[in-house]
């Protein structure tokens, strides 16, 4: 039986885990990136409006002894994570605005958005 934990993660923490590679895409689970800008824009609009989106599934981290960090893999949610990173890196616009065009208050609300994450323990 697969063990799992459901938790809520602030979008800022998810972004930081992706940037620092504490959370990585695993080709074993993930298909190639297929979302076009329109899909990414619609998804980011969901976050900006404060609507929920489906959980992101990750596998519990393996330990990188050299870096002394735990590295988790995205099982389901690569397209969404890629869209989030692309938006905060100003790779596409939503409603004719890049992320950097948002006011400080809008950015804070975006970063505080809570993401539902299901962490799977696939080693048991």
Where do the protein language model's features map onto the residues?
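Basic- and aromatic-enriched surface patches that contact anionic nucleotides/nucleic acids
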Residues: 1-14, 23-37, 41-124
């Amino acid at each position: 039986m697969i063990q799992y934990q459901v938790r809520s993660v602030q979008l800022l923490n998810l972004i930081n885990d992706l940037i620092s590679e504490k959370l990585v895409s695993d080709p074993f689970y993930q298909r190639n990136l297929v979302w076009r800008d329109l899909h990414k824009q619609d998804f980011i609009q969901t976050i900006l409006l404060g609507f929920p989106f489906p959980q992101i599934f990750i596998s519990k981290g393996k330990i990188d002894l050299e870096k002394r960090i735990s590295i988790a893999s995205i099982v389901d949610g690569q397209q969404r994570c890629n869209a989030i990173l692309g938006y905060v890196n100003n790779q596409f616009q939503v409603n004719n605005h890049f992320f950097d065009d948002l006011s400080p208050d809008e950015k804070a609300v975006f970063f505080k958005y809570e993401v539902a994450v299901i962490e799977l323990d696939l080693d048991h």
